Each structure stands twice: as C-alpha cells, then as structure tokens.
UniProtKB/Swiss-Prot annotation:
Protein name: Zinc finger protein 184
A cellular component term, taken from the record's GO annotations: nucleus
Highest taxon of the lineage: Eukaryota
KRAB domain location: 28-99
Annotated gene: Zfp184
Cross-link Glycyl lysine isopeptide (Lys-Gly) (interchain with G-Cter in SUMO2) mapped to chain: 185
Record organism: Mus musculus
Localization of this protein: Nucleus
Any Pfam family hit: zf-C2H2
Chain intervals annotated as zinc finger (C2H2-type): 201-223, 229-251, 257-279, 285-307, 313-335, 341-363, 369-391, 397-419, 425-447, 453-475, 481-503, 509-531, 537-559, 565-587, 593-615, 621-643, 649-671, 677-698, 704-726
Annotated keywords: DNA-binding, Isopeptide bond, Metal-binding, Nucleus, Phosphoprotein, Repeat, Transcription, Transcription regulation, Ubl conjugation, Zinc, Zinc-finger
Function: May be involved in transcriptional regulation.
Length: 737
C-alpha cells in the first residue's frame, strides 16, 4: 500500500474525503470495524456503555467516509442517527471464527454479557504503512484523534450464537477479545500494546482535555449548544441519543424497568436503582462534614453546598443564585410565567411535573407514604419526611445568626430573611412585598378570589390546600398534634408550638413601643397595629377595614349569613366557633371565670374583665363628642353610633336597623320565636339579659336601690319606673353592696 502524503494527512485533518488506493478500499468495509449486538446482549449494556458505543460507531463511520472507504450508509448508522436501538436479530449475526477464542478461554457457557469500557472502546489505533516518509508519519500521528479507535470487548460469558467479532487488520491493526469471568475478575490480555491514557483531545473553548475523541465531541456540544437528536413527536432536541430514547418513552408510556418490590415502572435503569434504595434503605453516599447519608450521589452533592454555601446557578433576570439546578429552573419560570404541566381534572397548571403528580393525588385520594409510628398516610415523600421529624424531633438545619434549629432547609431559608429583612417578591396589584414566593402566591388569591380547594363534606372552598386540610379536621375532629408535657392535643402544629411555649414561658418577641412581649412573631405583628392604626384588611361589601384577616373573615359572615357552628342541644347556629363554645355554657351552667375580689363567676373571660372594672372603676375609653367614658372599647364604639346615627346591622326580615349586632340577634328571635335561654324553671327567654333578670327571682338578688326610699329592684328598668312615682325623680340608681 502506498504511503500517505502530507497533503493527504492534511485533508483528513480538515475533514475532506481522502481517496486511498482501490486495493485498500476493497479490503476494509464498515462491517470490518463494527460490533453487532442481539437484543438480549443490548439489554446488558448500561446507558453510559450504549452511548459510548453509539459515539464510537458514528465516529468510525465518519472517518471511513472521510478517507473514502465507505459510500453507502449502513442501516445501523441510520438507526443510530435516529436514536433507535441498533440491536439485530440472532439469525442476522454471522457465525465467525470464535473456536480459537473459546479454546484460549478454556470455558464454554451459555449467555453473553458484554462489558464495554471507555478505556477499551477508545484504545489507540495504529494504521500500518511500510513506506511512509517520516514527515507524513509525524503529521499523521499528531492527528490520531481524528482516526478510528480500536475496540476491546470483554466477554463475561460465551454466546449461544457465535458472533463474528474479528476485525480486518488492514484498517485496525489489533482488536482485543478477552474473557472475564464474574467470579475471578481477571482478564486475558492479548494486546501487546498497553492502553495509553494521555489526554490528547483538548477543547479550544475552555482548555479541558479528554483521553478520548468522542468525549471531547460530547463536551463541545455544551459550548455550541448542538442538539442533533430530535424527537418526532414534540420536536424537542437533545445532545445525546440516549437522552432522546429516554424522552421518547414519555410519549409512548414505555417503562421497561420494573421494581420487584412494588411493581412501579421507570423509564431509565438508574431511576429504578435509585428507587430500590427506598425499599432497602441503602444510603451509600455520606457527607464528610455532618455524617448525613443519601441514596443518590446528586443529593449528596446538593447537600454539601449547604456547608460550602456554593450557589453555582445564577438567574440572569434578577441575579438570584441557587445551589440546585432544579430550583434554578423552577425560579426562571417565575419570570417567564411558564406552567407546562396541566391537571386534566381541574385544569390547574404547574411549573414542575412533580408538583402535578402530587396535586393529582388530591383528586384520587392516594396516600402512598405511611408513617410506621402513628399510621398516618401522606401523598408525597417530602410531606412524609417532614411528618416523621415530629416523632424523631430532628432539626438538622441551624441558623448561624441566632442558633435556632429547623427540621427543613426551606424553613431555615425563610427564617434567615427575618434577620436580613429581605422581601424580594412584590405584588403587582397593591405593591405589598413578601419574603417568600409562596406567600406572594397566597396573597394574590385575595385579589383574584380564587378558591380551588373544595371540601367534599360541606362544599366550602379554600384558597390553599393547607387550609382545606385544616378545615377537614372540623368534620373528623382529628387532633394529631399532642403536647408531650401535659398530653393536650391540637388540630394544628402551629397551635401545639404556641401551646408548648406556655410551659417554657418563652416570650421572645417584644414590642418596641410599649415593651409587651409575645410568644409568636405573628402576635407581635398584630399587636403593633394597635400603635400604627394599620387596618390592611377591607371588606368589599361595605368598605369596613380591619387590623386582622381573621376579623375580616368573621365580619364577612354578617353579609353572607353563614353560621357553620351549630349547637347540638338547641340547634342554634353561630358564625364563630368561640361563640358556640360560650353558648354551650348556658346549657351546662359552666362559669369558669371567677372574680378574685368578690368571687363572682362568669361564662366568658370578657365578662370577667368587664366586671373587674367595677372594682377599679377603670373606664379608659372616652367619647370625643360628650366625653362619656366606658370600660370597654366595644361599648364606646356602640355609643358613638348615637351621635352619628349609624345603624349598620339590618334585619333581613323587616329591614329594621340596629346599632349593635347583639340588638339585631335579639330582634331576630321575635321573627323566629326562638327562646334559647332557659334556667331552673321551664320558662325560656329570647335574650340572655332577660334570663339574667329572671334568675334574680330565684336567687332573691336585688342590687338596684332607690335613693329616696331605699327600695331595691332586680333590674334597672324596674328602678326607673319606680323613681317616676317620687316627686323628685332621681336620674340614676345606686348599686347596693
């Protein structure tokens, strides 16, 4: 064979076809440098090995075309370019001279498992030539990364169908075929030339070097953005054929990798391997800093960034950085507004497929994750993990500023914003800023009125899924959160946390205006509105504003007439749970609040507080119009309506208006005939004040005395009527002690 000239070598390097003598072209074909696999053999290759095989085969074919050795495109090349699997039928694999190989191996077995390593697939190739001039040889050797590489195939077991794995030495001088038994892990090395591991392939963009040319080609796609593998269904493109094949299974629904434990299917083999660690509990990746172990290496890498503080993913829109690529991708959808994943049940859209999957479990009621401690089930793994920390008390995330620990990293991140005061999320409607995106999303529902979460028991709708979960506990009366100190149970974790502080008496949040301390930061924020006069919650019906959201919710029930809390004794309904609790004491006769001065007992804490002012004569609330003082702010508000003439409470039956809600409630009983207040005798009353007056008949109590004749009466109205009998009518009766 004639030697390659310097010009020929340059043509090869520049990618131009290199025409060789006909004797050389006839001696080497694509079949001489290709390895065929059956479907069974192909299954034994992992994704990295398959991808490696594709790159090597395509590269070899490209070089054959470049030097003029291949004209027509083989079917295998078309399959590889389209991203399909290139295995062939058993009958299509030619039977070749493997007898010598079997004799050398000294073993005969039944099934074939191919272990193709990158080291073997990319071992150096030497093109022999007896008459090359030294200059051409040096140039050709400098460009060896452009030439096909040798293929070394390690066979773990021999095939039932003998494959022709011999390669013509005219083009590739040496092909290693070695037997590797799984029990011995030793290979029969038949190549006299050791594998070279110099990193000769260097990227011109970033300088990174690679041992193998195909690895450099894959790497360069990160700079060029080249994605040659395109999906015919959705036109999405990929840089690697293996990624295209996995993606196409999304369209076909093919999940060939099944879990033996639970039957769950997966698109990729590595996903199955990771999933199986849930059943085995295997966590092979351990953090050197804190000793925490993980089932996936990617999770360890992400976790280690907590210690290093590394945030390699930066948003070009707002400059915010993230430690995880998934969080970065999710964040970018905030700017684009992209929500590609849609629920077919309620048409709600999501930025992530995992969020859609978890949301769909709301419709199906599926709860696959069960707690072994208490038996409670959850529809998502993250919710289950958070719940499990309640039992273990684990709080691995600690704030560097104040030392407070949290069970979730997201809670730590949110907490740290209390130190920095950062509020990066602004509402476009009202301009209000929030520390967290989730808080902004919840706030936006106030403007839109969106309530996608509906209770199946009573039909009530909620803006947030968590609110629906909490509401359902009214029907189920579930109280899953129990205090370890006193055994008291609560429906909500926040209530338990608040209650536990009563044991420790911890009041960490202090008001800068008056020095009053609070257990919760939210309580401090509400208290501060007393000083600022801020009332951010407005009723759309009447325009009235409130300091607290809960007050607005309660107020709205006046307009809607909603009364969800019903008394089982008399059927009377209330718009607030606390009113029902107070009402039940009428039936039970419970008066848990006692005055320490005189021992008088009351059903309500507010009644006790009002009564105690009779001992101190404290009346801190003064009317600006007539300077009359009151012991309660509500009494002052009601009194001021005398001056303004305001009567905001209207009867839906007769349109009569009243200054106070209590008066409206009492008036409604005239229409319904309802008399819910009863005492020792069978007599019932429509108003609690009538009952109080009546009970004095049984007790013989007469507290109001006439100044003229010292006659005593049980009620103020009776005293007023009596005083009209005297020539000089007194204005006010005095209280007897």
């Amino acid at each position: 064979m004639a030697g390659l000239s310097f010009a020929d070598s340059a043509s090869l390097h520049e990618g131009r076809p290199l025409l060789l003598p006909s004797s050389f072209r006839e001696s080497v074909t694509f079949k001489d440098v290709v390895v065929n696999f059956t479907q069974e053999e192909w299954k034994h290759l992992d994704p990295i090995q398959r991808d490696l095989f594709r790159d090597v085969t395509l590269e070899n074919y490209t070089h054959l075309v470049s030097i003029g050795l291949q004209v027509s495109k083989p079917d295998m090349i078309s399959q590889l370019e389209q991203g399909t699997e290139p295995w062939t039928e058993d009958s299509c694999i030619p039977v070749g001279p493997l007898e010598d190989w079997k004799k050398r191996a000294g073993n005969s077995v039944s099934s074939l498992e191919l272990d193709i390593s990158e080291e073997h697939l990319f071992s150096e190739t030497v093109v022999t030539n007896s008459k090359r001039d030294d200059g051409s040889l040096e140039k050709l050797q400098a460009n060896q990364q452009m030439l096909p590489r040798e293929v070394q195939i390690t066979e773990k077991t021999a095939p039932t169908c003998e494959s022709n794995l011999s390669v013509s030495s005219s083009f590739i001088t040496q092909t290693e075929v070695a037997l590797d038994q799984p029990s011995t892990k030793t290979r029969a090395k038949q190549n006299s030339h050791p594998v070279k591991k110099e990193k000769l392939c260097k990227c011109n963009e970033c300088g990174k070097a690679f041992t193998y040319c195909s690895a450099l080609i894959r790497h360069q796609r990160t700079h060029t953005g080249e994605k040659p593998y395109k999906c015919n269904e959705c036109n999405k493109a990929f840089s690697r054929s293996e990624n295209l094949i996995n993606h196409q299974r999304i369209h076909t629904g093919d999940k060939p990798y099944k879990c033996d434990q639970c039957g769950k299917g997966f698109i990729e083999g590595p996903s199955l391997t990771q999933h199986q660690r849930i059943h085995t509990g295997e966590k092979p990746y351990k953090c050197d800093e804190c000793g925490k172990a993980f089932s996936q290496r990617t999770h360890l890498v992400q976790h280690q960034r907590i210690h290093t503080g590394e945030k390699p993913y930066t948003c070009t829109e707002c400059g915010k950085s993230f430690s995880q690529r998934g969080h970065f991708m999710e964040h970018q959808k905030i700017h684009t507004g992209e929500k590609p994943f849609k629920c077919e049940e309620c048409e709600k859209t999501f930025t992530r497929s995992t969020h859609l999957t978890q949301h769909q479990k709301i419709h199906t009621g599926e709860k696959t994750y069960k707690c072994n401690e208490c038996g409670k089930a959850f529809n998502g793994p993250s919710t289950f993990i958070r719940h499990h920390m309640i039992h273990t008390g684990e709080k691995p995330y600690e704030c560097n500023e104040c030392g407070k620990a949290f069970s979730q990293h997201s809670n730590l991140t949110q907490h740290q914003k209390t130190h920095t005061g950062e509020k990066p999320y602004d509402c476009a409607e009202c301009g209000k800023a929030f520390s967290y995106w989730s808080s902004l999303a919840q706030h936006l529902k106030i403007h839109t009125g969106e309530k996608p979460y509906k209770c199946s028991d009573c039909g009530k709708a909620f803006s947030y899924c968590s609110s629906l979960t909490q509401h359902r506990r009214i029907h189920t009366r579930e109280k899953p959160f129990e205090c370890s100190e006193c055994g008291k149970a609560f429906s909500y974790l926040s209530n338990l946390n608040q209650h536990q502080k009563t044991h420790t008496q911890e009041k960490a949040y202090e008001c800068k205006e008056c020095g009053k301390a609070f257990i919760r930061s939210s309580s401090l924020a509400k208290h501060e509105r007393i000083h600022t006069g801020e009332k951010p919650y407005q009723c759309h019906e009447c325009g009235k504003t409130f300091s607290y959201g809960s007050s607005l919710i309660q107020h709205k029930k006046i307009h809607t007439g909603e009364r969800p809390y019903k008394c089982n004794e008399c059927g009377r309904a209330f718009n607030q749970k606390i009113h029902l609790t107070q009402h039940k004491r009428i039936h039970t006769g419970a008066k848990p609040y006692a005055c320490p001065k005189c021992g008088k007992t009351f059903r309500h804490c507010s009644s006790l507080a009002q009564h105690q002012k009779t001992h101190t004569e404290e009346k801190p609330y003064q009317c600006n119009k007539c300077e009359k003082t009151f012991s309660q702010n509500s009494r002052l508000t009601q009194h001021q309506r005398i001056h303004t003439g305001e009567k905001p409470y209207k009867c839906s039956e007769c349109d009569k208006c009243f200054t106070g809600s209590v008066h409206l409630t009492e008036h409604r009983s005239t229409h319904t005939g309802e008399k819910p207040y009863n005492s020792e005798c069978p007599q019932t009353f429509s108003q609690s004040t009538y009952l109080t007056q009546h009970q004095k008949i049984h007790s013989g109590e007469k507290l109001l005395g006439c100044e003229d004749c010292e006659k005593a009466f049980q009620c103020h109205s009776a005293l007023t009527k009596h005083q009209r009998l005297h020539p000089a009518v007194a204005a006010v009766g005095t209280s007897l002690t």
